[in-house]
Amino acid sequence: MSELASFKTRKENFLKSIISKNPESINKYKRVVASPIRYPGGKSLAVGYIVELLPINIKRVISPFFGGGSVEITISKYLGLEVIGYDIFEILMNYWNIQIEDPELLYEKLKEIKPTEENFNNVKAILKDHWEGKIKLDPITLATYFFFNWNLSYGPGFLSWTSEIYLNEKKYEKMIERVRDFSPGNLKVGSADFRDILKKYPNDFMYLDPPYYIGPNSKVFKGIYPQRNFPIYHKNFPHEILRDMLKEHKGGFILSNNNCPTIRKWYKDYKQFFPKWQYTMGQGETRIGKNRRNAKSTYIKDSSEIIIFSPPKNKRRGVLNKV
């Protein structure tokens, strides 16, 4: 079987395996839990829709906005492609590097910390000192404390407040067992600005999940990366620069964003898809905010997503525009 046919078969088999069998669900595909970390805006329910669009003859995928990595890990683990992921949040990518290179050591370090509110507050204080440059943690300790703070927080969010439902030893043990057993396939990570990555890989296929657009007629009204109280990677994100650079990108791409008039207009020359799914906030959190209470909404939310697809343009390397 040729390499192209092999990837096509893996893709088809994977999509069949995640078809939702729940007749009451609007979700076409089941949630794919590939990442050890919870992530705001994570794509565990979008994996199937994105995999559908992957051209069958690409050899690797570049991700400039790695985040929680659900899509990227799925592509490397289940589809067998090389994936290189980047993110501007260095502390996050330090965690990912340790998670990939030494999951058992990370597990042992996490096992030493009990999931109590006292430990959460102590770890948060140390992480805050590192973030503010008062101390410098070694990579292993930084990865350990990041995971503990992040995965046990509400949201989740960096240096966020604790979530009681995760201060549970059984849940915590299952959580860190996923750290220990993590095996993502051919996945590499680094920390960089998306502009540098688009310049570095002009002919590679990309999956991009940037901070969602905040503006008129957008359902996203506040930045959340790395935390809603200091969204330095979200506020004033240069969406216009990303748009203009993607126009020149030859390798093809899939872009996720929020479905709003501005994004639809900016990318009107590309194929646009509007998948629908339902998700619960925090994948376990059932608290709802004042706005949703006033609107008599539940903690179950409908997606408002747009997925934009541009096939590879670079025929010089034998890339065919097949999906």
Report residues per predicted region.
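Phosphate/nucleotide-binding beta-alpha loop and adjacent structural elements of enzyme active sites
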Residues: 101-149, 153, 259-264, 280-295, ...
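SAM cofactor-binding core of SAM-dependent methyltransferases
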Residues: 52, 57-127
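Class I S-adenosyl-L-methionine
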Residues: 1-84, 192-205, 215-221, 230-323
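Catalytic metal-binding/acid-base residues of hydrolase active sites
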Residues: 89, 211, 259
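SAM-dependent nucleic-acid methyltransferase catalytic core
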Residues: 3-47, 56, 103-224, 248
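Short aromatic-enriched loop/helix-cap "lid" or pocket-rim segments at secondary-structure transitions
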Residues: 95-98, 159, 219-220, 267
